[in-house]
């Protein structure tokens, strides 16, 4: 076999810190390679043969390899192995995604779509959030320091001391290759469940991508224009639609290859079936539950709240999320190096109190910024729309920010924002850093505060689970005046202002609850059409509010002092660089 051409390289900024500052670091590749592979061969650790088999089986053409910073040393060798191992007649092209627009745990569908890739191989740690567009294979890596027999001895001691109690075993992704060994030990024990993780995402598993690939190849049997789904030319002999649906009647048009009216009429047939395959994240099977991307298959007891959790691995964001989301349950952690199974004593109460404090700040905020930190997780767009409607219904103003990877300088540019709410994957949704000038809330916290609901101790980091609560009882009709009731701890005066006692500052906070922008536009259009007189009271009220807001600002910009600055002749300034000016005393 002749050597294949070298792979195309596509990389973004290789920043090595969370704030995207580029730092030059010398890396010992051999030492890094030895530490990460930890006794496995290169092919075993990166599962090269499995990836090649999937590529050939599904006839993928453009493959994107997404690697985190700590695995970039393997990018060239990895891409060459895949490129050279697939026969030339398949005509594959391999790209390397060196860094992501957001967190490295999320699949970078944005960059991959720019490359028009049809398959992504995600290496390293993953949040396992459901995707919406492209099939993905997860390669987690491996570690050899876990001994299944030693773990079973410690677990048996715990189970013996806590009879009649149920346990669910979670594990770090690096120990996924040990999962079957653990399952074989406890498959006959109804009180112990071992979670399972699939190495492929939801798009690959439901095979929805195959319909798209089939139709791209067939191009609707070449009987339609190139823009098949938008074409008005219909062929009565074709029973195959662009959405992959089949019509039992060969004389009828099907799928998307119809006129605009026919597309609208049959949207719930072919196209809607494809849509449900892509964005449905709910599990209709009562015997299963999905937690942090891990599937739990229940045996007897089906209430997850009646289980204790066991975590195998080091401290991680996944463990933190389990502790926060299931704060009423016992969580045990197996310390691999010490061979001990101990109850995890993370100060959950303190963390929950901090999150409740941020939730109270949401009530005091007048302007709320929605920070988008993912463009690939399912229902992110619907969640943003729901947050905007909830904020507007509460008499506040929402602004949406897409700033890429989150850091302090980016958000510091928007001083008018009172508080931010972040839409991110469940592992990156809690931002507890004190470096940010304004607090960052989660969709769950914002929904809890703006609806003035009593907090029961429940906490949800996955906005996919928050979304049904977000749109619950929320009117989508902007003309509905009763869509947002005044909470019990707030009072509305004659001018429409809401008086709220802040538990954070201990003061009365006054917020103006004016009509939404959409309502004002609709009323203005109706007034212009009817020719009635226009009231300008609201306009003066808006000007008054803006003036009051500016008067409370401590910094109002540079003072021009026109006509007050004395005129002087030009003088010699400083020369050199900021590190060492020529006019410094040490250089004289």
Swiss-Prot record:
One of its GO terms (cellular component) is 2-(3-amino-3-carboxypropyl)histidine synthase complex. Component of the 2-(3-amino-3-carboxypropyl)histidine synthase complex composed of dph1, dph2, dph3 and a NADH-dependent reductase. Residues 1-28 are annotated as: Disordered. Binds 1 [4Fe-4S] cluster per subunit. The cluster facilitates the reduction of the catalytic iron-sulfur cluster in the dph1 subunit. Pathway: Protein modification; peptidyl-diphthamide biosynthesis. It comes from Dictyostelium discoideum. InterPro entries: DHP2, DPH1/DPH2, DPH1/DPH2_1, DPH1/DPH2_3. [4Fe-4S] cluster binds at residues 106, 127, 425. Required for the first step of diphthamide biosynthesis, a post-translational modification of histidine which occurs in elongation factor 2. Dph1 and dph2 transfer a 3-amino-3-carboxypropyl (ACP) group from S-adenosyl-L-methionine (SAM) to a histidine residue, the reaction is assisted by a reduction system comprising dph3 and a NADH-dependent reductase. Facilitates the reduction of the catalytic iron-sulfur cluster found in the dph1 subunit. The keyword Iron applies. Keywords: Iron, Iron-sulfur, Metal-binding. GO terms for biological process: protein histidyl modification to diphthamide. The keyword Thylakoid does not apply. The gene is dph2. This is 2-(3-amino-3-carboxypropyl)histidine synthase subunit 2. GO terms for molecular function: 2-(3-amino-3-carboxypropyl)histidine synthase activity; 4 iron, 4 sulfur cluster binding; metal ion binding. Residues 11-28 have a biased composition (Low complexity). NCBIfam families: diphth2_R (TIGR00322), DPH2 (TIGR00272). Belongs to the DPH1/DPH2 family. DPH2 subfamily. Its cofactor is [4Fe-4S] cluster.
């Amino acid at each position: 076999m002749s050597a294949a051409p070298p792979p195309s390289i596509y990389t973004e900024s290789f920043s090595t810190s969370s704030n995207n500052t580029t730092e030059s670091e010398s890396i010992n590749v051999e030492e890094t390679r030895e530490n990460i592979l930890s006794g496995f061969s290169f092919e075993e650790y990166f599962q090269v043969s499995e990836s090649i088999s999937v590529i050939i089986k599904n006839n993928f053409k453009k493959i994107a390899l997404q690697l985190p910073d700590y695995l970039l040393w393997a990018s060239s060798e990895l891409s060459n192995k895949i490129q050279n191992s697939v026969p030339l007649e398949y005509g594959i092209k391999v790209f390397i995604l060196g860094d992501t627009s957001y967190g490295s745990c999320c699949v970078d569908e944005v960059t991959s779509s720019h490359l028009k890739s049809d398959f992504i191989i995600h290496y390293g740690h993953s949040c396992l959030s459901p995707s919406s567009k492209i099939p993905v294979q997860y390669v987690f890596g491996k570690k050899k320091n876990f001994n299944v027999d030693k773990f079973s001895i410690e677990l048996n001691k715990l189970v013996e001391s806590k009879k009649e109690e149920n346990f669910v075993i979670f594990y770090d992704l690096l120990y996924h290759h040990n999962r079957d060994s653990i399952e074989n030990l406890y498959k006959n024990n109804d009180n112990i469940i071992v979670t399972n993780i699939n190495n492929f995402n939801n798009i690959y598993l439901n095979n929805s991508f195959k319909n798209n690939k089939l139709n791209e190849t067939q191009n609707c049997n070449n009987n339609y224009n190139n823009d098949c789904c938008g074409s008005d030319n219909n062929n009565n002999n074709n029973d195959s639609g662009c959405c992959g649906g089949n019509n039992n009647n060969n004389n009828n048009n099907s799928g998307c290859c119809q006129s605009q009216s026919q597309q609208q009429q049959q949207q719930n047939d072919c196209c809607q079936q494809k849509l449900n395959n892509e964005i449905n994240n709910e599990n209709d099977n009562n015997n299963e539950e999905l937690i942090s991307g891990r599937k739990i298959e229940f045996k007897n007891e089906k209430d997850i709240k009646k289980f204790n959790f066991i975590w195998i691995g080091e401290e991680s964001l996944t463990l933190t999320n389990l502790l926060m989301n299931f704060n009423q349950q016992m969580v045990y952690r197996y310390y691999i190096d010490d061979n001990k199974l101990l109850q995890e004593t993370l100060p959950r109460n303190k963390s929950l109190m901090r999150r409740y404090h941020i939730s109270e700040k949401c009530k005091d905020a007048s302007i709320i910024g929605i920070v988008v930190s993912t463009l690939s997780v399912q229902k992110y767009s619907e969640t943003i729309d729901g947050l905007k409607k909830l904020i507007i219904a509460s008499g506040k103003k929402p602004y949406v920010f897409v700033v890429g990877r989150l850091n302090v300088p980016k958000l510091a540019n928007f001083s008018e924002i009172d508080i931010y709410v972040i839409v991110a994957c469940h592992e990156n949704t809690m931002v507890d850093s004190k470096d940010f000038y304004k607090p960052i809330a989660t969709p769950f916290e914002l929904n809890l505060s703006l609806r003035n609901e009593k907090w029961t101790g429940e906490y949800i980091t996955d906005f996919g689970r928050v979304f049904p609560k977000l749109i619950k009882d929320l009117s989508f009709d902007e003309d509905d005046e009763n869509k947002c009731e005044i909470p019990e701890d707030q009072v509305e005066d004659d001018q429409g202002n809401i008086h709220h006692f802040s538990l954070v500052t201990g003061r009365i906070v006054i917020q103006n609850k004016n009509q939404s922008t959409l309502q004002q536009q609709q009323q203005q259009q109706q007034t212009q059409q009817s020719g009635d007189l226009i009231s300008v009271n609201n306009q003066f009220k808006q000007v008054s509010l803006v003036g009051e807001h500016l008067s409370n600002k401590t910094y109002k910009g540079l003072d021009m002092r026109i006509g007050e600055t004395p005129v002087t002749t030009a003088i010699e300034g400083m020369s050199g660089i900021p590190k060492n000016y020529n006019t410094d005393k040490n250089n004289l």
